[in-house]
Curated annotation (Swiss-Prot):
Lineage: Bacteria, Bacillati, Actinomycetota, Actinomycetes, Micrococcales
GO biological process per UniProt: tRNA modification
This enzyme's EC code(s): 2.5.1.75
Native organism: Tropheryma whipplei (strain TW08/27)
Recorded GO MF terms: ATP binding; tRNA dimethylallyltransferase activity
Protein name: tRNA dimethylallyltransferase
Length: 286
């Protein structure tokens, strides 16, 4: 992998920025590297919360920043790798997040359970007509209302993507659509070939899965398959379609970053030479 090659050659540590790899025991469906595959390179922000809990980007940002300071203190280089657009941006751009209130959140969760998330969605749009969110995105709707009630302000986040913290070097890995489609299809096939269904079965025996874990791409489909709601073929197809949508969303997100280095990964060996050149110049290594 390109990140492992870079960390190996530049005395680096990997700091995970994939929100789903934060969860313990969710390995196959998140494409988490095994310990042996990590080649002895230190990895951070992996397996840090149970699937029964809910990840928080605000908590993640603070933890990741602490990791980065620790890595710098070791005279090593942190490689933030991922992943989830908001999680990456939270660190790279030092985003500030509104406060939380567990009491308000609980009231909203209970109301959504009783009356349906559509009621809360309608209320949110009445309060802030310009806010855009899918009617079925329960977590984001509840968080938006929580922010609106606590602060009295619009829940729309302001993402200062022109301002970068900590002198990050941003390398955006791209490839043509045909190559991407093939890679995504192979990725999804590997999930099921490597035992995603069994992994989900064990997760259900060990944990009461939280909303995020239960709705994760691949895991949601495996849960539906185990419940007899869909066939294995339909589970695979749905996983692939959601994976493609997520990839397209990530492409659009990272395209907005200013001052980024774009590297075509169609040929991985060529791509790594470009990455090495970028890092050599940035670190002034001859």
């Amino acid at each position: 992998m390109l990140s492992l090659d870079a960390a190996r050659d530049f005395n680096g540590h990997i700091v995970n920025a994939d929100s789903m790899q934060l969860y313990r025991d969710m390995d196959i469906g998140t494409a988490k590297l095994s310990h042996s595959a990590r080649q002895g390179i230190p990895h951070h922000q992996i397996d840090v919360i149970d699937p029964s809990s809910e990840a928080s980007v605000a908590r993640y940002k603070l933890s990741a920043q602490t990791c980065i300071k620790h890595i710098h203190a070791l005279n090593s280089i942190p490689f933030l790798v991922g992943g989830s657009g908001l999680y990456v941006s939270s660190v790279v751009h030092n985003l500030q997040f509104p406060p939380t209130d567990g009491r308000v959140r609980k009231l909203l969760e209970d109301e959504a359970d009783k009356s349906g998330i559509g009621v809360l969605h309608d209320r949110l749009l009445k309060l802030h007509p310009g806010f855009t969110v899918s009617r079925g995105n329960r977590r984001r709707i509840i968080r938006a209302l929580e922010v609106a009630y606590i602060t009295g302000r619009s829940p729309n986040p302001v993402l200062p993507l022109q301002n970068r913290a900590n002198n990050f070097i941003v390398i955006n890995l791209i490839c043509d659509k045909g190559t991407l489609d093939i890679r995504l299809q192979k990725r999804v096939e590997s999930f099921y070939d490597n035992g995603l269904i069994d992994e989900v079965r064990l997760l259900q025996e060990k944990y009461v899965l939280g909303r995020t874990a239960a709705k994760a791409i691949g895991y949601k489909q495996a849960i539906m398959y185990l419940a007899g709601e869909i066939s294995c073929a339909d589970a695979k197809d749905s996983t692939l379609q959601e994976t493609i949508r997520l990839a397209n969303k990530q492409i659009k997100w990272f395209r907005r970053y200013s001052g980024q280095h774009i590297v075509d990964t169609t040929d991985m060996s060529v791509a790594y030479e470009q990455i090495r050149s970028i890092l050599n110049k940035s670190f002034r290594i001859s």
